[in-house]
Amino acid sequence: MSYIPFPNISPELFSIELFGVTFALRWYALAYIAGLLIGWRLVLRMIRAERLWSFGPPMTEDQLERLLTWVILGVILGGRMGFVLFYQPAHYLAHPLDILKVWEGGMSFHGGFLGVMTALVAFCLKERISILPVADLLAAATPPGLFLGRIANFINAELWGRPTTLPWGVAFPGEAAQSCPGIEGICARHPSQIYEAGLEGILLFAVLSLLVWRRGWLHWPGSVSGVFLAGYGATRFLVEFVRQPDAQFVSAGNPLGLAWQISGYGLTMGQILSLPMILLGLYLILRSRRTA
């Protein structure tokens, strides 16, 4: 069976030791930082492009700088609490202090999304500015961060896919990745992180950029947010078919790791959380076109 060996890349970009304590910059942290900075620059560019707006941009550059702080808090707190509540509530209920151990991993995009939306609504109410136009700005600028995050997932050798015999399957390191029932020898898996980087990062960014810069969709508040939500939800829903589910959902009677099932059919937790995003996205698209 042909497969691609996992590249020997350290999850740490570099580390330094000060006063007996080791500080390391991990690729995952760098992806968060770079994603936020790129997103900020993209939003700033859209705010400055007067032709994109019917009655001017929804917020000033100073308000954008203040919003960035709210978004950072929403991403971190929402992402962490989403993982705690959606994926391992029993563990963290028994060990509540483990919630603070963010360096051990455990972030949820869907939780981060809810955190950012909460921060966005609170900020807009405080600043007395319209929510949907600002949401459109954030939606159009989010995919580069998703792309970098998925590449960091790949470098960390985490969130890999299900076993595959396809020639581009990757032999991820680690006992968990190489534990494949019914497969002897090397176990190759779908590089689902790369699939997601291409779909929710590159493809979604290309579509949103076309709609913003060529089609003028920022003139219809909610339309860009709707495309982002429906697009991310749909791509995540599809990739879940080849993505290895979280270990806590997998058992002898549930080898596919379905969080909900009936008569042998069901959905993973990622698919369950993506369905509301798809429905909300479609609603926003229809609403924006109806009120145009």
Swiss-Prot record:
Main localisation: membrane
Name of the encoding gene: lgt
One GO cellular component term: plasma membrane
Protein name, entry field: Phosphatidylglycerol--prolipoprotein diacylglyceryl transferase
Annotated a 1,2-diacyl-sn-glycero-3-phospho-(1'-sn-glycerol) binding sites: R150
GO BP field: lipoprotein biosynthetic process
EC nos: 2.5.1.145
Top-rank EC class of the record's enzyme: transferase
Cellular compartment(s): Cell inner membrane
Function: Catalyzes the transfer of the diacylglyceryl group from phosphatidylglycerol to the sulfhydryl group of the N-terminal cysteine of a prolipoprotein, the first step in the formation of mature lipoproteins.
NCBIfam families linked to this entry: lgt
PANTHER family xrefs: PHOSPHATIDYLGLYCEROL--PROLIPOPROTEIN DIACYLGLYCERYL TRANSFERASE, PROLIPOPROTEIN DIACYLGLYCERYL TRANSFERASE
The species this protein was found in: Cereibacter sphaeroides (strain KD131 / KCTC 12085) (Rhodobacter sphaeroides)
Pfam family, one: LGT
Homology family: Belongs to the Lgt family.
Transmembrane spans: 18-38, 67-87, 105-125, 193-213, 222-242, 266-286
Lipid bilayer topology: Multi-pass membrane protein
